[in-house]
Amino acid sequence: MTCNPPASATFTCPKPARPREARIPRAGLTADRLVAAAADLADEAGYENVTLSALARRFNVKDASLYTHVRGLSDLRTRMALLAGGEMIDRIAAAVEGRTGKAALAAFAGAYRGYALAHPGRYAATQIRLDEATVTDSPALRRTAEVTYGLLRAYGLEEPDLTDAVRLLRSSFHGYCALESAGAFGAPRDLEASWDRMIDALHLTLQNWPRRAAD
């Protein structure tokens, strides 16, 4: 349509309406790519700094575009935990394979510590509490339980001592790694030497696990 304004009047021809642009999903954007990018961001900037907005900026898309692939931040963090948990148990299982006793314990602990220090954001993701259904449905988490409990059964432990021993190892490894990452060990004692002595102490504790009083 042609607009011909009258010569004697101040008149501006209306601009033609712009056609509505259809949003096209970013090629190659998948849930797996988002979760991997979120894990990388956690390692680089810190777990608490992983947000949907920060992730959207990485892919140069609107925040709303991410909801096609994840249900929200909670879902993203759950997926990060499963990704990191799978990576971590792969390292641990490979380190423990073919080893028994103290050698297996030291290999397990070393792989745990190595992953925690190399991937602080991913490691932080593994510390969130997951619902029972998610844990049950995750092959990686089931494998984690199998490897961990297998290590401790070799010391002759049975329930409920098995669960108590798992908690002892987890709190020892996690506490040491958290303090080391924070630079909180101020004494001049060599960190590797202290770590090795902790493994010695844990091995002796597991070998001489206290008997429970009869119920």
Q: Where do the language-model regions lie?
A:
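Residue-level preference for short helical/loop micro-motifs built around acidic side chains
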Residues: 48-49, 74-75, 103
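Short hydrophobic/aromatic patch on the recognition helix
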Residues: 60-70
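Amphipathic alpha-helical segments used for helix-helix packing
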Residues: 113-135, 178-186
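Alpha-helical structural segments
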Residues: 33-40, 44, 58, 75-95, ...
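Amphipathic C-terminal alpha-helical segment
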Residues: 171-188, 203-212
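Hydrophobic alpha-helical connector segments
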Residues: 93-124, 142, 159, 169
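Basic, helix-initiating cap at the start of DNA-binding domains
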Residues: 1-45, 54, 58, 74-78
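Amphipathic alpha-helical packing segments from all-alpha helical-bundle domains
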Residues: 132-168, 189-204
